């Protein structure tokens, strides 16, 4: 089975999501072959499955060598479908965040309309898409925990020493990039609300200097960086990404983690923090809000910043009541990388057997609707493979 992922080389990305899934899927089933690249999407018809990740990447807006129109995208999807190449997509976003180009926004609807499977990282988007795209099979494929990558759980004392932090403070962790000033406002709100408390915020990428050719733009970047350093001393940031080695220490030193997003559907930070036993505070938005509420973690209202300090206080209270330990159990039971990889393999194989005569359509419909659980689905696929 040959599968094309519509993204650039995943082994050159800071985000381990794609390479972790690729490596673990290949360990489980050596018959699955992966390739990637936007150019191959437009030129190559030799794949069994085309798995689309971020639809707007296919247009390459602003790249004169690879730029394509929305009309060209729809024609290409029609060609793939006519050649019986299966089209599937993962719903990382319903529409792209912070994009204003109308064709980039419309590319999402275009791809989802042509997808036979749409994989969802939570039940919120799955519910929305079952109404909006009823002809697709909307399937749950949660964000994995990279338990093969993060194997160390250093003690709080060891983590404090490693990161050169004082034991006098409680720490709130915000990992990941800050995409807009409205996300920085969340952190500044916490600092102002807890100025009399011994609380610091670990936000490595809170502000970074982007080196630009324009000297005035560069001066502005440096000024902004220094301004935050001087005025917000309780925000600990370096402007650099945290290595996989150091990330375990950041996780271990923090009791509460904040997902600093206003516009969001999914978050890789959420399952990872659960795995390390932290309580997670996040926006009551998308799959993130749905998962947090379902598991008893605090949420805040993105339209009311005053709800954020309330959620943070609740987060610390819940940590001391043992919610972090419960979160860890949830992650270990549901989100380990092997479990999610197994699930993805089964979904890929469903594409093959769903079009094959002799397979019970009633069972397939039950699997697609979620009325047959994953374990039964996996056993059914093994049986079909033996009978094929």
List PLM regions with ranges.
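Donor nucleotide-sugar binding/catalytic pocket of nucleotide-sugar-dependent glycosyltransferases
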Residues: 116-130, 134-152
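Short hydrophobic beta-strand element within catalytic cores of glycosyltransferases
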Residues: 259, 279-283
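Conserved acidic donor-binding segment of nucleotide-sugar-dependent glycosyltransferases
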Residues: 294-306, 313-320
């Amino acid at each position: 089975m040959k599968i094309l992922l519509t993204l650039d080389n995943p082994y050159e990305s800071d985000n381990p999501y794609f390479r972790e899934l690729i490596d673990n899927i290949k360990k489980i089933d050596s018959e699955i072959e992966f390739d990637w690249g936007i150019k191959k999407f437009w030129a190559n018809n030799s794949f069994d499955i085309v798995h689309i990740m971020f639809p707007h990447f296919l247009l390459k807006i602003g790249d004169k060598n690879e730029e394509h129109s929305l009309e060209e995208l729809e024609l290409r999807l029609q060609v793939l479908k006519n050649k019986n190449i299966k089209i599937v997509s993962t719903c990382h976003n319903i529409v792209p965040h912070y994009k204003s180009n109308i064709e980039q926004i419309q590319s999402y609807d275009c791809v989802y309309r042509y997808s036979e499977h749409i994989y969802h990282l939570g039940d919120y988007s799955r519910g929305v898409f079952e109404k909006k795209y009823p002809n697709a099979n909307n399937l749950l494929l949660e964000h994995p925990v990279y338990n093969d990558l993060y194997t160390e759980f250093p003690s709080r004392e060891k983590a404090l020493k490693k990161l050169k932090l004082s034991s006098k403070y409680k720490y709130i962790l915000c990992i990941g990039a800050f995409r807009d000033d409205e996300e920085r406002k969340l952190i500044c709100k916490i600092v102002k609300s807890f100025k009399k408390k011994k609380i610091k915020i670990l936000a490595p990428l809170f502000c970074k200097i982007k080196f630009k050719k324009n000297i005035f733009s560069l001066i502005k970047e440096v000024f902004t960086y220094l301004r935050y350093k001087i005025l917000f001393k309780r925000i600990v940031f370096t402007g650099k990404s945290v290595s996989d080695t150091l990330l375990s220490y950041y996780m271990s030193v923090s009791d509460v983690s904040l997902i600093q997003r206003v516009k969001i559907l999914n978050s890789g930070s959420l399952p990872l923090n659960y795995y390390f036993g932290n309580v997670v505070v996040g926006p009551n938005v998308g799959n993130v809000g749905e998962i947090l509420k379902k598991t008893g973690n605090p949420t805040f209202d993105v339209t009311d910043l005053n709800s954020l300090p309330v959620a943070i206080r609740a987060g610390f209270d819940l940590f001391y009541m043992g919610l972090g330990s419960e979160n860890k159990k949830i992650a270990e039971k549901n989100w380990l990388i092997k479990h999610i990889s197994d699930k993805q393999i089964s979904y890929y194989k469903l594409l093959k057997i769903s079009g094959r005569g002799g397979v019970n359509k009633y069972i397939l419909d039950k699997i697609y609707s979620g009325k047959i659980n994953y374990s039964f689905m996996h056993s059914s696929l093994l049986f079909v493979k033996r009978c094929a």
